[in-house]
Amino acid sequence: MTFLAIDVGNTRLKWAMYDAPKPGAAVLAHGAEFLDHIERLADSAWAGLPAPTRMLGCVVAGDAVRRRVMEQMEWWDVPSHWVVPSAEEAGLVNGYDHPTRLGSDRWVAMIGARHRLLRQGPARPLVVVMVGTAVTVEAIDAEGRFLGGLILPGHGIMLRALESGTAGLHVPTGEVKLFPTNTSDALTSGGTYAIAGAVERMVQHVIQHCGEEPACMMTGGAGWKMAPSMTRPFDLIENLIFEGLLAIAAERFR
């Protein structure tokens, strides 16, 4: 039974074909496409793939983009399933005031992180950071309850906001420095430390609430840029959303 996982973010669609809908399944093929080029999938990346038996995806880019993805899947004749956050799924309890309003990417990534944590050892609190166009910082207690999370602009959005709202800041991308001595480095360092500070504050909240140090995981396309600037060790995971989709699929499609 083959399984297609799809993650439709704000700028790109990422996909992976697995040999089974369960954690630990082998990857048969994978790829990514910018949202502007979704219509290429059926005739290019997906053209030589066998029809998946099952499909599960999450989308944050809106219904119009989701419909475009479904059109590319029509020739496979496989039912499409999309994650909508609920009160509880795959061992994670949703603490959001209105569970269905939580971003599906956040929900799926947290499920992936929780399952990865339990495979590694005993349950403990968890902080999950997803670094992309936007940055999310989630807190989960040892019992598997999502306590709440932060949303803040990603590094690119911060820089564009400063460039558009401030005269004279159209400068090349700089480096992260302890004591920046030019505008490029000051902008890059400021954005990086703003994100790192939000993460550190959430970690402290979890310690105060749960009474113990949380495990810390980071994912997302820009995670590798942030990891060296964190004040504590983070496990850098390539794609927690795919891991979450596999965990959900194992329960839904068994």
Swiss-Prot record:
Keywords, ordered alphabetically: ATP-binding, Coenzyme A biosynthesis, Cytoplasm, Kinase, Nucleotide-binding, Potassium, Transferase
GO biological process: coenzyme A biosynthetic process
InterPro entries the UniProt entry points to: ATPase_NBD, Type_III_PanK
Residues annotated to bind substrate: Y96, G103, S104, D105, R106, T183
Molecular-function GO terms, alphabetical: ATP binding; pantothenate kinase activity
Enzyme nomenclature, EC number: 2.7.1.33
Catalytic activity: (R)-pantothenate + ATP = (R)-4'-phosphopantothenate + ADP + H(+)
Principal cellular location given in the protein's record: cytoplasm
Residues where ATP binds: D7, V8, G9, N10, T11, R12, L13, K14, T133
Active site feature: D105
Enzyme class: transferase
Superkingdom of origin organism: Bacteria
NCBIfam families the UniProt entry points to: baf (TIGR00671)
Protein name as annotated: Type III pantothenate kinase
Source organism of this protein record: Paracidovorax citrulli (strain AAC00-1) (Acidovorax citrulli)
Gene name for this UniProt entry: coaX
